[in-house]
């Protein structure tokens, strides 16, 4: 890691065998080291993380550390033995899903297991309804990951995720307040581009570049959001 960058450690968490778990400043990592850093990571997925360390992003809501640690133990062990990331994450996801089910998360959005998962059950609060009819919701990210998509991170919208109702954008409540505006910009820009016929890969890359620029030039965020209909 370049010397000009600060270390993102916030708090030493638990130790699991040879592994040290750290709570880290994910917003700083995404803004200065790796814009694609998600909720957690380990060395073989993100080489800038020292070996035998697990990094978990500081969460604004809903403690998911136990799920992430169980995932990382499997993922790191398999990749250390030569498994590909694709194979390792498949097995790690299975372990994580089992833990989430054991803690009763899925029952909370399926009316105690009697119905299919209800998207409205993950709504925390309506952030804003835009003039074009799109509703932006802050959602319970833990329940989204438990019931709909274990890889859901930061935000999403109806043009990418089939479980997001039509005309909705979701912002993960695990993202801290001071970072939500950048995630919101990414999701609105990406959705607008896809609604205009641009394929996901291109729309996502454009949105990532725009988000990254505004993270480094936060004075531009207000105007960038306005251009996407956030007025």
What is the predicted role of each segment?
Residues 1-66, 80-181, 195-231:
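Metalloprotease/metallohydrolase-associated module, dominated by Zn2+-dependent proteases
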Residues 67-79, 182-191:
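Active-site recognition of the HExxH zinc-binding catalytic motif
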């Amino acid at each position: 890691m370049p010397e000009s960058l600060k270390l993102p450690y916030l708090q030493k968490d638990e130790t699991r065998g040879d592994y040290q778990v750290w709570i880290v400043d994910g917003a700083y990592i995404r803004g200065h080291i790796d814009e694609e850093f998600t909720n957690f990571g380990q060395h073989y997925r993100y080489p800038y993380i020292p070996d035998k360390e697990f990094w978990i992003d500081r969460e604004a809501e809903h403690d998911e550390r136990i799920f992430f640690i169980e995932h990382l133990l499997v993922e790191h062990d398999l990749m250390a033995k030569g498994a590909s990331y694709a194979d390792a994450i498949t097995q790690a996801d299975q372990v994580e899903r089992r833990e989430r089910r054991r803690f009763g998360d899925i029952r909370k959005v399926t009316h105690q297991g009697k119905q299919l998962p209800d998207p409205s059950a993950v709504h925390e609060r309506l952030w804003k309804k835009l003039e074009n009819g799109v509703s932006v919701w802050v959602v319970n990210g833990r329940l989204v990951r438990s019931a709909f998509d274990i890889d859901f991170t930061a935000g999403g919208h109806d043009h990418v995720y089939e479980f997001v109702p039509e005309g909705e954008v979701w912002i993960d409540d695990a993202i801290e307040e001071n970072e939500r505006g950048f995630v919101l910009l990414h999701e609105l820009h990406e959705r607008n581009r896809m609604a205009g016929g641009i394929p996901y890969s291109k729309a996502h890359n454009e949105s990532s570049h725009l988000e990254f620029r505004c993270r480094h030039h936060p004075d531009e965020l207000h105007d960038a959001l306005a251009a996407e209909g956030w007025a």
